[in-house]
């Protein structure tokens, strides 16, 4: 079963809106078999200059669209620097609310999947024993 993962990371204040990190993450996740939702591919880049310039109404609209996309994902993938981004924090809260798995860019997803598989689980098994996003706060 192919799982859908949403990439979340800081954009404002980053060189080229952090495009390189988003696209590298997309390639890496595609190679691991995920269906990837990269917000840069969904029109956010079209409006990014206005968002960076401070168009609050447009930013709110984009965030609503992103929250709707996260609802349809199994996981969220947090790029480095996510803790400094209020937008990413909001996306994370949304993902936790929809019981998405949380992966960090610094995390070895394959190793995590193998470890959980050996324990008779997958990262997608939720039995209420673990809190989604546990360990994200480190």
Regions found by a protein language model. Give the residues of each.
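Conserved catalytic or regulatory cores that recognize and/or transform ribose-phosphate-containing ligands
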Residues: 1-138
